Amino acid sequence: MARYLGPKLKLSRREGTDLFLKSGVRAIDTKCKIEQAPGQHGARKPRLSDYGVQLREKQKVRRTYGVLERQFRNYYKEAARLKGNTGENLLALLEGRLDNVVYRMGFGATRAESRQLVSHKAIMVNGRVVNIASYQVKANDVVCIREKAKKQSRVKAALELAEQREKPTWLEVDASKMEGTFKRQPERSDLSADINEHLIVELYSK
């Protein structure tokens, strides 16, 4: 599947917020002018219409999770079919992606690196190798690093970085074993308040 391979900081500047596409726990606004649009001089951002605001929010979330447009739309359709709040269902589906769970557990420094670990068959779910980044992890699934991948320096570095991040309450991780359990789907209160999923629902409801 095609992936965006351009500058990561450019995407964060376009959305006006840190999308956490680079490794590390320090906010990137100390390294680049995040409030400015991409480009050498950072052209002034125009005032957005309601549609523009909704579109930017969708792009921000889509890029945060590293999902392409068609797949993101399919996630929305699935979220709308499920019972409950469509916006919260959408976030739950994105959080349940295997590459995201690997990132949340601290096995990858970024979601992109976590996706690579999955595609390179370095990840096991319930004792079986899974190399599909979009695989939906379910409650009580056990995710771990394959034995032969445990010596990779990038995995060890990612775990060290994860120690500096807030630990998700819906996961249980044993860093020494490089293993974690997906205890439950995260609740809306567990996730970033910077995401306004209602804008995405409004966008796709038109």
Curated annotation (Swiss-Prot):
GO molecular function, one term: rRNA binding
Family from the record: Belongs to the universal ribosomal protein uS4 family.
Signal sequence coordinates: none
HAMAP family referenced in this protein's UniProt entry, alphabetically: Ribosomal_uS4_B (MF_01306_B)
Taxonomic classification: Bacteria, Pseudomonadati, Pseudomonadota, Gammaproteobacteria, Enterobacterales
Entry GO terms, CC: small ribosomal subunit
Disulphide-bridged cysteine pairs: none
Purpose: One of the primary rRNA binding proteins, it binds directly to 16S rRNA where it nucleates assembly of the body of the 30S subunit. With S5 and S12 plays an important role in translational accuracy.
Gene3D superfamilies the UniProt entry points to: Ribosomal Protein S4 Delta 41, Chain A, domain 1, RNA-binding S4 domain
Native source organism of the sequence: Enterobacter sp. (strain 638)
Keywords: Ribonucleoprotein, Ribosomal protein, RNA-binding, rRNA-binding
A Pfam family of this chain: S4
Gene Ontology biological process terms, A to Z: ribosomal small subunit biogenesis; translation
Cited SMART domains: Ribosomal_S4, S4
The S4 RNA-binding domain, residue ranges: 96-156
Subunit composition and interactions: Part of the 30S ribosomal subunit. Contacts protein S5. The interaction surface between S4 and S5 is involved in control of translational fidelity.
Protein name: Small ribosomal subunit protein uS4
Record-linked InterPro entries: Ribosomal_uS4, Ribosomal_uS4_bac-type, Ribosomal_uS4_CS, Ribosomal_uS4_N, S4_RNA-bd, S4_RNA-bd_sf
